[in-house]
């Protein structure tokens, strides 16, 4: 199988990311894995989604660090691929990490994923569902039994009162964003 992985940027992927592990496992099982950065995708005039993608030549890796080094280095393959030729496209980018830096990249994986679906590519992590889950309100759609007691507000006095009610131990998250940013 040919599997594409849309990531924020190949240069910022690390050897501990799940995407790197999945791509390496695919290669070790005899599949082709292509990493595609958000800025590497194009929608061509002939209605095909294409991408500047990177893959590896070797077929067996013991460490994700070596896999990633070879993918990025001179031993790695860089080709402009037609996304329609992939068997599966996995959307693995993190739109929240692009906010304020590369705002154009926030929705690009989702948009290109939608275009690939229209061309018959199996897209894992449904682009429409990902778009719905762009902020923490999405979690409120889950059953009450599987989510923590939640307050969503910008009012600091309400946050302080909620913290007191919870015994002073709460987790504060931005509505949209990650890592305390948003």
Language-model features: where?
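Active-site nucleotide/adenylate-binding loops and adjacent lid/helix of ATP-dependent enzymes
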Residues: 2-182
């Amino acid at each position: 199988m040919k599997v594409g992985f849309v990531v924020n940027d190949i240069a910022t992927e690390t050897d501990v990311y799940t995407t790197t592990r999945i791509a390496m496992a695919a290669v070790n099982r005899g599949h082709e894995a292509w990493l595609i950065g958000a800025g590497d995708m194009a929608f061509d005039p002939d209605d095909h989604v294409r991408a500047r993608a990177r893959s590896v030549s070797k077929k067996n890796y013991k460490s994700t660090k070596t896999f990633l080094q070879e993918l990025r280095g001179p031993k790695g393959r860089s080709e402009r691929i037609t996304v329609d030729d992939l068997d599966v496209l996995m959307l693995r980018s993190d739109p929240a990490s692009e906010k304020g830096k590369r705002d154009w990249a926030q929705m690009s994986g989702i948009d290109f994923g939608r275009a690939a679906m229209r061309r018959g590519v199996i897209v894992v992590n449904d682009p429409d569902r990902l778009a719905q889950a762009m902020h923490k309100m999405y979690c409120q759609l889950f059953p009450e039994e599987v989510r923590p007691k939640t307050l969503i507000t910008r009012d600091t006095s309400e946050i302080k009162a909620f913290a007191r009610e919870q015994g002073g131990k709460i987790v504060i998250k931005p509505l949209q964003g990650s890592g305390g940013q948003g």
